[in-house]
Amino acid sequence: MRKILAGVSAGTFALLYGMLVLVLLIIFELTGVPLITAVIASAIVLLIQFLISPFLTDLTQRWFYKTKFGAEMPPYLKAFIEQVCHEQNMKYPKMGFIDDGAPNAFTYGHTKNNARIVLTRGIFELLTEDEVKAVVAHELGHAIHYDMLLMTAAELVPTVLYAIARGLMEGMKSSDGDSDSSKSAAAQAIIAAVAYLLYIIAQYIVLWFSRTREYFADEYAVEATKNPEALSRALIQIGFGLSTHADTKDRKRGMSASSTNAMGIFDTKASKSLVVSCFVDGEIDKTHIKNAMKWELWNTWAKWYELNSTHPLISKRLQAIDRLAPQYGRAPFVNFDLQKPESYLDDFFREIAISIAPVIAFLAAAVVAAVLFIQERMGLLWVAAVLLIVSAVLSLLKYRFTHPANAYHEATVAGLLAEPKVSGIRSIPCELKGTIIGRGDPGCIFNEDFVLQDDTGIIFLDYNQPLFILNKIFALFRAKDNLDQTATVRGWYRRSPVPYVELYTIEAGGKTKKIFTYGVGKVLRWLYLVLAVAALAAVFML
């Protein structure tokens, strides 16, 4: 594994820094300007950020997440970490604990000798001892592989390329209007465009590199625990969150806080995860697990979301772990064998079309209006007004598609998860009943979102009022009143890439809270249509 890991790292850095050197050589050859200042400045900023980031993150964790560093870990976990540290010749990491029922785990730091690992109460409540060790082994793998340091070095390239593109564009604005300056400006414009294009490419290479590091961290976790099934179970519960054992509730009752730019077990942006029971009559029922995997392996949206993510899709990680299982005398845990019933590509393009159609119509209206004004053909401005009306109508139709107003059917987390035809655009109106067990961003006092648990699992609830300040006031002063309360929620189930419910109403603690974003959005779209019609009327009155 180490040779492959070194080869992947070397190849990635050769490609990234090769792109950067190419741009610098082109700049020097065509303009004579080395732009070394921009390169040095970007490198210094990134270096300073790298050096102080762990300490700033420590403060953020203490102040905003109430993270307790130095918390006593369970004996089995402490012994496991000590064993790994001894084998890898590394210092015992600084352990942090967040008293929140939502599961999360992540690591940060400079090197393996000053790594921090933070775990939430939900990790201990949802996972068995072997699964907890697998999660921590994954985080230790990041530290042992120097992933924090390598990712910082990789991110330097797109940072410098962006600085070059911006610097060249700013230089063009201050150039004189003579012939030589015009030629220089044209050259700078071409180089700026190339630098920006390479910046975008470099960003995607860095994301790919990050996803690759996750696979290697998984591989290390399997190597350290000799238990691929434990890591698969843990990923299923944290990433999908599928519960793979029957004693979760008993373990949860016995767990308390007293007993127990980071790289996590899964993408923190994708923390809207859920837990679904897969334990039936004393045996693991793989049906729910395979249902959860269908969306990631079949739906085209999943591939798009993964392309823009720092972490691979959970289903792909499970398949990679299954391929490792025979090396440790184990059978593959999941063995996804379902047949794709249809192509979901048509749904993907249909939803994209629905999403961008109002914008295209608006841009068409703006272009037509601009051309007519330039040509002083005011008599044809009605064409632009009609296009504006079309844009408004399409906006209303899009909103009706993204927020179906039909009945909110009673559902379960397990039932919603099994639906492959859903995305950030296509939703399912639903009603869920359960208990609010934590905040969406575990422990964060500024986070207004929740995690709800029903009889089949847990799911993220997206609480989003029209004004940002209203969300933060609710997070600081009202959100805590809903924790550990029985709740009924209504809203729209989505997946982008992980499952969540966009809230419309939430009933908890005998009180009903309504989220007004849907209503405000609807009013604004009708107002848009009224203004578009008024514009058409004004054109005919000219």
Regions found by a protein language model. Name each.
Residues 87-114, 170, 175-183, 208, ...:
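Active-site-proximal gating segments in proteases and membrane effectors
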